[in-house]
Design a protein with these regions (language model features):
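Short beta-strand segments in beta-sandwich/barrel cores
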Residues: 8, 41, 82
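Residue-level marker of intrinsically disordered, low-complexity segments enriched
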Residues: 10-14, 148
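Anionic-ligand-binding alpha/beta catalytic cores of soluble enzymes and soluble regulatory domains
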Residues: 14-62
Length: 165
């Protein structure tokens, strides 16, 4: 009988495995996880209707639903890239979490504010690539404070992608 042996991959005294990479993603350590994956961690789904609050604040978002068992990064705000069905892609600021400033519930959402984009993506399938965690999710004292922070996160995302190939 043959016994298949896997070759161990060790880097910086750490055994690199799918379990280790999943742990990195679950902790929001996207840059390190992506190094080991060889590509960005990605969620692909159909854009769903949300509460449209982002649009009223000046930040329309694409809302992704995800199936149970899908590996979603830790709650927080990320620099992401969204690719549309036509192949075009744009940087986005994406929040994963329970939206504590505007919701009292515990339903986890994935919402991406696509930078420099106007259009209707409802019903389209998009691919969202996660590159860097900008900050953890937090509750803001007002919608105005939330808007200011989204603007800062948008600038951080622009700066991040301006240095990437």
């Amino acid at each position: 009988p043959y016994r298949r042996q896997r070759q161990m991959c060790i880097r910086d005294s750490i055994t690199i495995s799918s379990t280790y990479i999943r742990t990195l993603v679950a902790q929001g350590e996207m840059e390190r996880a992506n190094q080991f994956l060889g590509h960005p961690h990605t969620l692909t789904d159909t854009v769903a209707h949300g509460k449209k609050l982002g649009g009223t604040l000046g930040f329309p978002t694409v809302n992704l639903r995800f199936q149970p068992g899908v590996l979603v990064p830790a709650h927080g705000v990320y620099a992401t890239r969204v690719t549309f069905e036509n192949g075009e892609s744009r940087p986005a600021v994406t929040n994963i979490g329970v939206r504590p400033t505007v919701d009292d519930g515990d339903r986890v959402t994935v919402e991406g504010f696509i930078l420099d984009f106007q259009g209707d993506l409802y019903g389209q399938t998009v691919r969202m690539e996660f590159y860097k965690r900008l900050r953890g999710e937090r509750k803001f004292p007002s919608l105005e404070a939330l808007k200011d922070e989204v603007m800062r996160n948008a600038e951080q995302t622009r700066a991040y992608f301006s240095t990437q190939p």
